[in-house]
C-alpha cells in the first residue's frame, strides 16, 4: 500500500523490539516514534547498547519490530513479503556503515555502479550514473582506483557514492565516521551535509560523536531503548 499524501522519507510509530532469551525478556526498543522529513538530516546519539543500531536495522527493513509500524517513502511495510521489502529497500534506501564493505576486486567506479547493475541496468548507463555520483563526492579522478589504493576517507566516500547512486529517499548511516581519524571524520561529515543539501536526500545518522551530531538539522538521544530530544 502506498500513501501518496505522506511527505516523510521515513515514518516510524511506536516501535518496540523485544528478545525472549529463556526466562529473560530483553526490551531493546521501547515505544520509539520517529519521522525523517524529505531532505532532513537527523543524528541519533547514545551509548553502546542503547538500541541505536537495532533502530537503524528496523528502519532499513533489515529487522522487524515486535510491534509498531513503519512507512518508508510512502509505502507501509507491515506484512510485506521479504521480496517486497527488498524492492522497497533497494528503491528508497541507501546504507553507509562504519566499515566501507567495498569489493576489493572492483574499481571505485564499478563498486558504485554495482547496485544499478544488480537492478539489470545497462552497464554503460550504470557506469555513467556512478561517474556522476563519484564527482559529487569529489572522487572523479579516482574512479579507476581499487579500494586498496584509496585512503580510509576515500573508501568511505566511495561507500557514500554507492549509497547515493540509486537516488534513495533516505540514507541510513551507522557510525559512518567511526573508523576515521578526527580530521577525516570532520571532512566526511561536511561532505554528508553538503550532499544532503545539494541532492535533497534525507539522512538518518547514528554516531557516538556529539560534535558531529550537532551539525545535523535535528539531534535525538537514544537511552535504554527510548528516543528522546537531543
Swiss-Prot record:
One of its GO terms (biological process) is lipoprotein localization to outer membrane. Its main location: membrane. ATP binds at residues 46-53. This is Lipoprotein-releasing system ATP-binding protein LolD. It comes from Bordetella avium (strain 197N). Keywords: ATP-binding, Cell inner membrane, Cell membrane, Membrane, Nucleotide-binding, Translocase, Transport. Residues 10-228 form the ABC transporter domain. InterPro entries: AAA+_ATPase, ABC_transporter-like_ATP-bd, ABC_transporter-like_CS, ABC_transpr_LolD-like, MacB-like_ATP-bd, P-loop_NTPase. Belongs to the ABC transporter superfamily. Lipoprotein translocase (TC 3.A.1.125) family. One of its GO terms (cellular component) is plasma membrane. It is found in: Cell inner membrane. The keyword Signal does not apply. The complex is composed of two ATP-binding proteins (LolD) and two transmembrane proteins (LolC and LolE). It is a peripheral membrane protein. Pfam families: ABC_tran (PF00005). Its EC number is 7.6.2.-. The gene is lolD. Part of the ABC transporter complex LolCDE involved in the translocation of mature outer membrane-directed lipoproteins, from the inner membrane to the periplasmic chaperone, LolA. Responsible for the formation of the LolA-lipoprotein complex in an ATP-dependent manner. GO terms for molecular function: ATP binding; ATP hydrolysis activity; transmembrane transporter activity.
